[in-house]
Amino acid sequence: MRHGYTNSTVGDGALVVKCYEGPEAEVRLRTESRFLRRLRGRLPVPRVHKITPTSVTTRFVPGEHGQDLLDDGRAAEVLAACGRALAGIHRLGIVHGDYGPQNMLFDPVTFEPVAILDWEWAHPGPPVEDLSWCEWIVRTHHPEHVPLLPRFFEAYRREGGPEVPSWGDRHAAMLSRCRDLLDFTARWEPGGGGEKLWRDRLDTTSAWTA
């Protein structure tokens, strides 16, 4: 998958195979397979086809990648849809752990989510983790769409999500997640490119103001 970051994901148009790499790969594989099975029929998630000790194979889901739609001028629709979908996730008492348009596929006509991907970091936790990370993705990879972030938060609230935390709380959650990923990459390849990338991203995020 062109937008994958930490794992190897390949598909043939019928099935998608995700191979887990890096620290705690087995734990992340078990987490993702468990949540995909648990959430099937409750949220738009791919159907599990096969699980091996190193990979999860799911059925292919046709749809447009969220980041591609942002680049194609559909940021308002995509961010609103992200907000609605996230409220549904949080109603189940879970946190996705890597939430945002980078892990979503959308119907190209209605712009409704057809698949929420990459559940390997899912866990019980506070909503601010997902709210702040979706915002971080936009601020980092699509800064031109930062003015449209209110569409995301407003849709989340309209769909029944709790009150959106303050900028200070969201910023603190972003920094915490960046530190987690810095630690992850440092353990995976000490002194490598991933560690440098996340150190730079942590520094950049630290300098942000509302």
Predicted regions and their residues:
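Conserved kinase catalytic-core helix
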Residues: 39-43, 66-102
